[in-house]
């Protein structure tokens, strides 16, 4: 198994270079299986887009914490890596029945930096306490690898462009000796448009896509000495648009532009654990994004959109 370090969008962006809506695929020549490949790519983009949203968002917005900080000015910084097992399809060989075989399986990790800041300590028992939430997503750009490009308006830091997330966590009740802390949270995350290829420079295909995510979470957490435990559930909405162009042959339908709207929602659940050593905490998470039957016409070996997907997170926290 290989390991790769990618932006969530880059997990499936190569697919989008051949993707189009069904009617757009009809304009592509059927010779050599080009139209069948296009239709399979459409299904793959629909299937894998929520996985990109999942690995961007993770589960708990503050690993191993179920409630708010409980005091104004408290700060928690988390250096986090989300990941999942990605089944990479081989679109060069599609069976007559529409089955796409798996080319490889990779562990796809995505780095995120997150912050929690106490704003309001709340009323009695922590009710209506408020924490501000923030995140920074690291997105490779043209300085990271040849052929990549990122939104020119995106904030850049050397070889990466930055995507940002903002939100809030509201306390329901504080933790006591006999009960866990409870909280609700909402976050909005945005990954800048990222792409590769340039048909004007001689490439056969080019593609770019963006991703926006809304994350709603309900969490509970408890501490037992050094041990931190939290669990929760939530709902995500992912949206974006993929644009592309292709110049694959001189035949009619061998050149053109495409645009594919992407809009999906998913439920998920997660369990966290951690060890606290003063201001340092080692944390982890395992979660599950529930599947949705999208009635795909293509079967992808190793992937079932109705079965859901498991994701993982590891994090190092600093609390002040």
Regions found by a protein language model. Name each.
Residues 75-81, 115, 132-134, 168, ...:
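Membrane-embedded beta-strand positions of outer-membrane beta-barrel proteins
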Residues 177-267, 272:
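Detector for outer-membrane/organellar transmembrane beta-barrel domains
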Residues 88-94, 142-154, 193-203, 240-252, ...:
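Outer-membrane beta-barrel translocator domains and adjoining extracellular loop/strand segments
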Residues 21-164, 172-174:
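Transmembrane beta-barrel domains of Gram-negative outer membranes and organellar outer membranes
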Residues 22-24, 264-269, 274-320:
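Predominantly the C-terminal beta-signal and adjacent terminal strand-loop region
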Residues 71-75, 126-130, 176-182, 214, ...:
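Outer-envelope beta-barrel architecture signal
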Residues 81-87, 119, 136-142, 172, ...:
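Transmembrane beta-strands of outer-membrane beta-barrel pores
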Residues 71-73, 106-113, 156-166, 208-214, ...:
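Residues that define the transmembrane beta-barrel architecture of outer-membrane proteins
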């Amino acid at each position: 198994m290989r390991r790769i370090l990618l932006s969530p969008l880059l997990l499936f962006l190569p697919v989008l270079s051949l993707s189009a809506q069904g009617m757009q695929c009809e304009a592509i020549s059927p010779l050599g299986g080009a139209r069948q490949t296009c239709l399979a790519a459409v299904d793959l983009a629909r299937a894998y887009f929520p996985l990109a949203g999942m690995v961007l968002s993770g589960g708990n917005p503050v690993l191993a914490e179920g409630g708010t900080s409980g005091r104004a000015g408290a700060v928690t910084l988390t250096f986090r890596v989300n990941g999942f097992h990605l089944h990479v399809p081989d679109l060069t060989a599609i069976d007559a029945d529409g089955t796409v075989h798996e080319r490889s399986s990779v562990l796809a990790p995505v780095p995120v930096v997150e912050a929690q800041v106490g704003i309001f300590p709340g009323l009695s028992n922590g009710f209506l306490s408020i924490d501000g939430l923030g995140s920074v997503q690291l997105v490779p750009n043209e300085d990271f690898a040849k052929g990549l490009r990122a939104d020119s308006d995106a904030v850049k830091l050397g070889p990466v462009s930055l995507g940002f997330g903002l939100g809030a966590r509201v306390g329901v009740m504080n933790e006591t000796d006999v009960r866990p802390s409870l909280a609700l949270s909402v976050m909005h995350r945005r990954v800048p448009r990222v792409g590769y290829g340039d048909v004007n420079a001689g490439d056969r295909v080019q593609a770019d896509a963006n991703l926006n995510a809304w994350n709603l979470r309900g969490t509970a957490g408890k501490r037992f000495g050094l041990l931190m435990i939290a669990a929760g559930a939530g709902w995500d909405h992912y949206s974006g648009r993929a644009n592309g162009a292709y110049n694959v042959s001189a035949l009619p339908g061998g050149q053109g532009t495409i645009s594919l709207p992407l809009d999906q929602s998913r439920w998920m659940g997660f369990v966290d654990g951690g060890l606290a050593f003063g201001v340092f905490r080692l944390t982890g998470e395992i979660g599950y994004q529930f599947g949705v039957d999208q009635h795909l016409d293509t079967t992808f070996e190793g992937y079932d959109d109705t079965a859901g997907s498991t994701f993982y997170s590891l994090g190092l926290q600093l609390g002040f």
